[in-house]
């Protein structure tokens, strides 16, 4: 262990986690690459857990931010009116919302994903006058009490230290037995007065569950869930903190399903540059907040408004979205071939778009593959309740050449774990 790393062992809490998976001291990053203090280069298939969809230190965003700081632009403003916030709101409306025929009010609840989830739950309860929320198995929504209450992971929930109440967990699409119609099961509870389940204020879900195992809901499942919500006057909250901002191939992860959620939670890559920013979008008729009823010191991050506005300009060019879709096809073709070529993995391809991975029934395999990949210069994490999925999450801007290099490292890592000497895929 080097001297720098020993500082973290001595002074930082045991709660730290990613530095255990990636034991290096990083000093520099650009695009989809990172370098450690020894000069070792890594291809980044992690992208800040989805906070760096545009890569590290994007030139357009960096220049806009440097110019703003050099001009003594305001940094902290709570929810006061500033030019950067006005520019961001206008760009979001013109480039993202209007073209998709989405009419949403924008709320800045605080700097992180859990802030937007907390505000969404709070608003849903305020609007409906109901207390209960329906969440789904393997969902992950944050680490504060409200968002943790709608999270499925047992180890995360255990950290709360108190009962997590006013939430009913229902089975996600294809949970357990893939033949079971989980929404028919859910609706039975809503319809039957003897079920013991009250009509909730809202349902909250990810269209692709990130931390829960890269579980992608089918489009027809999402459409049916929206119909159920409308039938029972339940608000539908889509948590797009990780699955949004192009990660699944479109700006919002729900676009392909053709649904219109009542409330949308955004964070991570909405700031563009990796700077903290969160938004809660909701239909105008739900905007019944009293001034200051929900607030937070760091909800006016002007540096993030600057980079977020620059990031949205990518979406003005249709070729950007097309490139995401083209590279997504390559990712899924590679994963499919890998599963077919190495049956010893007992694996299956999971996810959608740039939110993909392989789930393996071989105990510990995913973690071992990720560790071998790191040794070979690729940063990749695991997901799922048992860490049974190794997860591909490269920046959307990655070059085809380095995407292929990443694929080669992953296959080498799979071979190393399985003890296969020669590559099987070509």
Curated annotation (Swiss-Prot):
Its cofactor is pyridoxal 5'-phosphate. The keyword Transferase applies. InterPro entries: Aminotrans_3, Aminotrans_3_PPA_site, Dat, Ectoine_EctB, PyrdxlP-dep_Trfase, PyrdxlP-dep_Trfase_major, PyrdxlP-dep_Trfase_small. The modification N6-(pyridoxal phosphate)lysine is found at residue 268. Coiled coil: none annotated. It is an enzyme of class 2 (transferase). One of its GO terms (molecular function) is diaminobutyrate-2-oxoglutarate transaminase activity. Pathway: Amine and polyamine biosynthesis; ectoine biosynthesis; L-ectoine from L-aspartate 4-semialdehyde: step 1/3. The keyword Transferase applies. It comes from the Bacteria. Signal peptide: none annotated. Its EC number is 2.6.1.76. Belongs to the class-III pyridoxal-phosphate-dependent aminotransferase family. NCBIfam families: dat, ectoine_ectB, PRK09264.1. This is Diaminobutyrate--2-oxoglutarate transaminase. The lineage of its organism: Bacteria, Bacillati, Bacillota, Bacilli, Bacillales. The gene is ectB.
């Amino acid at each position: 262990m080097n001297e720098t790393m020993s500082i973290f062992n001595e002074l930082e809490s045991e709660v730290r986690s990613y530095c255990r998976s990636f034991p290096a001291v990083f000093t520099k990053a650009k695009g989809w690459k990172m370098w450690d203090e020894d000069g070792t280069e890594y291809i980044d298939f992690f992208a800040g857990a989805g906070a760096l969809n545009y890569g590290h230190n994007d030139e357009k965003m960096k220049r806009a931010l440097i110019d703003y700081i050099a001009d003594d632009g305001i940094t902290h403003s709570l929810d006061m009116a500033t030019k950067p916030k006005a520019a961001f709101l206008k760009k979001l409306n013109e480039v993202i919302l209007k073209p998709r025929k989405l009419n949403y009010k924008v709320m800045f609840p605080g700097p992180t994903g859990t802030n937007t989830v907390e505000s969404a739950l709070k608003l849903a309860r305020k609007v409906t006058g109901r207390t209960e929320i329906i969440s789904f198995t393997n969902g992950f929504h944050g680490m504060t009490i409200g968002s943790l209450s709608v999270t499925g992971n047992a180890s995360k929930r255990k950290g709360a230290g108190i009962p997590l109440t006013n939430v009913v967990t229902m089975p996600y699409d294809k949970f357990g037995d893939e033949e079971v119609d989980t929404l028919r099961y859910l609706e039975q509870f809503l319809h039957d007065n003897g079920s013991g389940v009250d009509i909730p204020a809202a349902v909250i879900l990810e269209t692709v569950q990130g931390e829960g195992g890269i579980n992608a809901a089918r489009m027809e499942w999402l459409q049916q869930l929206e119909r159920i919500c409308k039938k029972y006057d339940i608000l539908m909250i889509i948590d797009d903190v990780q699955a949004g901002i192009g990660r699944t191939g479109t700006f919002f992860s729900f676009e392909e399903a053709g649904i219109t959620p009542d409330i949308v939670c955004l964070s991570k890559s909405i700031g563009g540059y990796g700077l903290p920013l969160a938004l809660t979008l909701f239909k105008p008729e739900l905007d019944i907040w009293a001034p200051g009823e929900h607030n937070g010191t760091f909800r006016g991050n002007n540096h993030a408004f600057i980079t977020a506005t620059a990031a949205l300009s990518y979406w003005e060019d249709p070729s950007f979205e097309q490139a995401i879709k083209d590279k997504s096809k390559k990712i899924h073709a590679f994963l499919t071939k890998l599963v077919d070529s190495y049956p010893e993995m007992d694996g299956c391809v999971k996810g959608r778009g740039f939110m993909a991975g392989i789930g393996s029934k071989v105990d510990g395999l995913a973690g071992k593959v990720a560790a071998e990949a790191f040794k070979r210069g690729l940063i990749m994490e695991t997901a799922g309740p048992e860490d049974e999925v190794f997860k591909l999450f490269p920046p959307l801007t990655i070059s085809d050449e380095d995407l292929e290099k990443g694929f080669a490292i992953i296959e080498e890592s799979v071979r190393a774990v399985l003890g296969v000497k020669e590559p099987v895929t070509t």
